[in-house]
Each structure stands twice: as structure tokens, then as C-alpha cells.
Amino acid sequence: MWPLSHRHLCLAFLLVCVLSAISFFLHIHQDSFRHGLSLSVLCPDRHLVTPPVAIFCLPGSPMSPNASSPRPQHPASLSGTWTIYPDGRFGNQMGQYATLLALAQLNGRRAFILPSMHAALAPVFRITLPVLAPEVDSRTPWRELRLHDWMSEEYADLGDPFLKLSGFPCSWTFFHHLREQIRSEFTLHDHLRQEAQSVLGRLRLGRSGDRPRTFVGVHVRRGDYLQVMPQRWKGVVGNSAYLRQAMDWFRARHEAPVFVVTSNGMEWCRENIDASKGDVMFAGDGQEASPWKDFALLTQCNHTIMTIGTFGFWAAYLAGGDTVYLANFTLPDSEFLKIFKPEAAFLPEWVGINADLSPLWTLAEP
């Protein structure tokens, strides 16, 4: 065996030092997750109107310097019982579910959902949170907390072992650091996914008869929002001009797209969306009592055009790809802006197209 030279010994020593440093770094890095998330970093300025309440970005969120995704705590290390009051429609309850899951993990608590939320979501998704029995719910000494719709510092340090949340949270600032886990929770059951893919597979471009190369889901929120937005919130819903601009944005960037339109106002869509190019398909059934068919279609598309509402948000969030949304859809003095922060509602990479507010100015005239 050849004797080791002085140079070989030095190289071996340096190698041991490097390996030791790497091992120490990994140990510290893992401990930081084991002992919880750091919330010392505020979201940097996005050059939007600064909200009166600071919005926190958790590590792993789009605007956080730490882009790694934290590991959820093992169930054995969790304690207490947290739940959330299920309120609103399909998209609202998805937001409540995701927020409960994220905040409970962040605070080291066990999360349970109430039976009505399970009844709304379990037929559609492979959700995993256990259901809280009604008799346990009635006997639990709850403290109640109503959430606003963005992540705040106080939500990261809630000491209550028995907490019932409420409100309509649907902001990525609560749960985007757990995005893969959230997407896993909202995985469609196979039969819904297969049915949606079958519908998309039958679509053809009108002029050529070719298969589309790109599927763009379009959700047009109508229904009660036609009255609620202008009368209560000084706001508008997406009109035909907005939808035309959004579609043109995709036509300019993607080859042979097809627009898969769903809405709770399909008749309006057929009358107001220009389908003369042969690339618009009115595929939704518009049944608000059974929204999962339209939702499944949207999530199986490559990209999304949304107007307003949580249904469109979740379709875009789960589909991935490019998202175009209706921006600045209320007057500046709208009370809606006290409970809704656009910078906390829409992911930074999503593309906003400003709404046409002229109908509101017409209403305001004497």
C-alpha cells in the first residue's frame, strides 16, 4: 500500500471539514422545520395600495425569500381540537378547509371538519381531515375566532386548544406554503376526472376540426352577483369586453387554444361571447346545485380565465398554468375593499385586466 503524502492528508482533512459542515447545516435546517415556521418576514411591497393590515408571507410563499416548502407536523405531535364553521357555497368551503388545515398545522393543533363540510367536499375530493361528531362539537368548550381574508401575524400564534374558526378566508397567504398538500387534498375522484377528460377529449376546433393544443378554462360568475356587486359593493362582474381581452391574451401566447366556458349564466355566455373563431366551446351545465362537473372541467384545463369569486379562484389554483383575472372591479370607496385585499387574493404571477367601471358611474349620476 502506498504511503499517504502530505498533500493527500491535507485534501482528506479538507474533505472531512466540508462534509461536517454540510451535515451541520442540514441538521439545523431540519430543526427549523421541526420547531415551526418563522414569520419574521413581511411580504415585500408589490407596488400596490398598501393595506391597513400587514399581510404575512409564510416561508415557501411566492414572495418569501425562503422558497422551500415546510413539512407538515406529524399527527402524533399535534394536540387540541380545531374546526371551522362551514358557510357559503362550494368555493367558500374549499377556502375554509384549506385555511383550517394550514392554520392548525402552523399552531400544532389537530384539525377536524364538521359533517356539512364533509358532505359538500368529500363527494368531489379525496380530502383527509377527520369529521367531528356532533356530540363532540356540542360538548367542546370552544373559543370562537372570525378570520379576515389574509394571513396576519396573530394567526401564527394562537394558543387556544379548542378553537372554532369562522369567516370566508380564501387567500393564498394562508396556505400557499403547503400548495402541494392542498392540491393533494383537492384531488378529484377518478370518475370525475375521467368524465371531465372525456369531455375535453371530444372537443375540436371549429374551423379546422383539429384537436386543440391548449385548453383554457373560462369561469363566468353571474347569478346573484349581478345584483350584489353593484348594489352592495359598488362593483361589477366580468363583461363581454373583458372576456374578449382575456381570450385575445391567450390567443397571442398559445398555439391553437380552445376556450372551455362554464358559468352559472350559460345563456348570457352564449349570447355575449364571440364564438365565431371556432375556438369557444360552451361546455358547462351551469347547475349550481351540482357544481363539481363544471369545476372538474376547469381543473383539467391547462390555463384559466376567471371573473370574480372563489369558485374561479380554486379552479385556477388547481389547474396551474397561466391565469387571467378581473382586476379593480370595485370603485375605490367600496366597502368591499375593507374585507378583500387584491394582493392577498390573486397570486403575484397571475395577470389582471382592469374591469370597466363605467356602468357604476352611470348608476351614481342623479
From Swiss-Prot:
One of its GO terms (molecular function) is alpha-(1,2)-fucosyltransferase activity. Its EC number is 2.4.1.69, 2.4.1.344. InterPro entries: Glyco_trans_11. Residues 1-8 are cytoplasmic. Glycans are attached at N66, N302, N328. The chain crosses the membrane at residues 9-25. Pfam families: Glyco_transf_11. It comes from the Eukaryota. It is a single-pass type II membrane protein. Belongs to the glycosyltransferase 11 family. This is Galactoside alpha-(1,2)-fucosyltransferase 1.
